[in-house]
């Protein structure tokens, strides 16, 4: 039986959804944090946007691997002796960042510093 155009479109949608599964899983964990633990702890992030919004945007833009490293770097900077202020997710992938050098995704010091 010859595959029809309709079935090949359906297969493409399934493949696209499978590739987005890790990204959506990471975003789901952030959503759960926002709606369960965050209201109990209180809204007291030192940065704008908040760390959970930053993490959600970073994972949406760069995937679970790259966005997860960006979020880890942000969480490590969000402490009493860390940075504060406006710190947006970069619009493009940081220079030198690749899947085998994930620490290059994170901004480990400063706010909006390269």
UniProtKB/Swiss-Prot annotation:
Q: Enumerate the InterPro entries for this protein.
A: Membr_insert_effic_factor_YidD
User: Topologically, how does it sit relative to the membrane?
Assistant: Peripheral membrane protein
What GO cellular component entries does it have? Answer: plasma membrane
- Disulphide bridges: none
Which regions form coiled coils? none
What job does the chain carry out?
A: Could be involved in insertion of integral membrane proteins into the membrane.
User: Which family does the UniProt entry place this protein in?
Assistant: Belongs to the UPF0161 family.
Q: What is the protein name stated in its UniProt record?
A: Putative membrane protein insertion efficiency factor
Please name the source species.
Nitrobacter hamburgensis (strain DSM 10229 / NCIMB 13809 / X14)
């Amino acid at each position: 039986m010859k595959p029809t155009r309709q079935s090949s479109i359906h297969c493409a949608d399934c493949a696209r959804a499978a590739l987005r599964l890790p990204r959506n899983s990471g975003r789901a964990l952030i959503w759960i944090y926002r709606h369960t633990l965050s209201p109990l702890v209180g809204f007291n992030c030192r940065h704008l946007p908040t760390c959970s919004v930053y993490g959600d945007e970073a994972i949406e833009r760069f995937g679970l691997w790259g966005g997860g490293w960006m979020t880890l770097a942000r969480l490590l900077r969000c402490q009493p002796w860390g940075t504060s202020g406006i710190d947006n997710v970069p619009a493009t992938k940081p220079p030198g960042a690749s899947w085998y050098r994930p620490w290059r995704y994170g901004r480990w010091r400063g706010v909006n510093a390269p």
